[in-house]
């Protein structure tokens, strides 16, 4: 009988709640107003002959490399950051190797590492969800071959200082160290450049968040030029579709659009944090386009809150299943108009839940 590999049979399933997403989508950290008008114009003017030809990635990689200030040989365009994670695991992990992941964090680090046959070593973050470099260093062994750190982290929005990331990378030269900068635009600090001196350091960026192109599935993997040929051997030569490749130059050319969107998101983030503080709801200071807040003590509390917000047309994400996140929800931020709708629904939901809780105690 045909059977999947044991590593695959034991994989945890990742099923994001994609069904029934009617309303204001503040649950997946997407750009809530969409991509740049230049990208839309590019789509309208798309040469249909491009769809009949295999996509040519290299010219766009050179364009992206110039935008990032790195050499083209250091850049690989990927089918979203997910593929970049997969490629690193396929390139560097052998069965029985160890992958170090600071939790809570993005689920696909664990899944791709396990699929490669690695043993995942989960390192709990501190009370404030801050990465502790010493704790990570203490979990690194001679079997460690992959270390994944999202910076800013998802779902917490917290960040690790560059010096800590450098310490980790220099302390584990035998491991591929990924710094996932999917939310870079909302934070502004990067590890790009250090990859030239550290051949085991890799940085990823995405066009799914600030750029509003999640449906086109485009990401960037940057690494030392000596390492990238090995990763290219694992990658499909046609991994990024022609439509995405046609749109990427237009996307990076319109930085005014990105900067204005980011400014509105940061303003909305501040407004949400002020509101949460006023209601004495615990939250973690975020450097991303979302905020993680502890609505209650249990999964039931966060589930009830998510349902009440959904009833008001606002979708947010229940993160109670993540380590240390019991009773927590993650709320994506958008421009001013969306922020106003969010805060109104938030106030109404909090008022209603207080009434229900008060009635249950009486």
PLM segments and residue spans:
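Conserved PLP-binding catalytic core of the aspartate aminotransferase-like
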Residues: 266, 278-312, 329
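Short acidic capping loops at alpha-helix termini that bridge into adjacent secondary structure
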Residues: 71-75, 95-98, 143, 181, ...
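PLP-dependent enzyme catalytic core of the Aspartate aminotransferase-like
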Residues: 308-312, 317, 321-362
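Active-site phosphate-binding strand-loop segment of PLP-dependent enzymes
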Residues: 127-181, 185
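PLP-dependent aminotransferase class I/II
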Residues: 200-284
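N-terminal small-domain helix-loop-helix segment of the aminotransferase-like
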Residues: 2-82, 87, 353
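PLP-dependent aminotransferase-like
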Residues: 91-149
């Amino acid at each position: 009988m045909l059977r999947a590999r044991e590593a695959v049979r034991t994989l945890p399933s990742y099923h994001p709640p994609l069904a029934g997403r009617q309303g204001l989508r503040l649950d997946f950290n997407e750009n809530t107003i969409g991509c740049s008008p230049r990208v839309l114009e590019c789509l309208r003017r798309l040469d249909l002959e491009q769809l009949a030809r295999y996509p040519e990635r290299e010219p766009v990689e050179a364009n992206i490399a110039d935008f990032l200030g790195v050499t083209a040989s250091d850049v690989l365009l990927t089918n979203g950051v997910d593929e970049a994670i997969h490629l690193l695991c396929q390139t560097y992990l052998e069965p029985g190797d160890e992958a170090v992941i600071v939790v809570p964090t993005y689920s696909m680090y664990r899944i791709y590492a396990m699929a490669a046959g690695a043993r995942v070593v989960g390192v709990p973050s501190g009370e404030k969800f801050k990465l502790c470099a010493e704790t990570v260093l203490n979990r690194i062994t001679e079997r460690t071959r992959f270390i994944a750190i999202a910076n800013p982290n998802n779902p917490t929005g917290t960040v690790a200082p560059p010096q800590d990331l450098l310490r980790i990378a220099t302390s584990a030269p035998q491991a591929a160290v990924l710094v996932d900068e999917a939310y870079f635009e909302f934070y502004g600090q990067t590890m790009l450049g250090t990859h030239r001196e550290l051949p085991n350091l890799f940085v990823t960026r995405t066009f799914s968040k600030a750029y509003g192109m999640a449906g086109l599935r485009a990401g960037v993997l940057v690494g030392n030029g000596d390492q990238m040929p090995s990763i290219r051997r694992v990658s499909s030569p046609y991994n990024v579709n022609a439509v995405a490749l046609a749109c990427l130059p237009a996307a990076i050319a319109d930085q005014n659009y990105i900067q204005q969107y980011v400014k509105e998101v940061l303003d909305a983030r501040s407004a949400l944090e002020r509101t949460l503080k006023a209601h004495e709801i615990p939250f973690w200071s975020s450097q991303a386009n979302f905020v993680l807040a502890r609505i209650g003590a249990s999964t039931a509390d966060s589930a009830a809150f998510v349902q009440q917000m959904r009833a008001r047309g606002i979708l947010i994400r229940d993160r109670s299943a993540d380590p240390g996140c019991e009773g927590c929800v993650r709320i994506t931020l958008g421009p001013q108009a969306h922020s106003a709708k969010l805060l109104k629904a938030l106030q109404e939901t909090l008022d209603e839940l207080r009434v229900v809780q008060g009635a249950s105690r009486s």
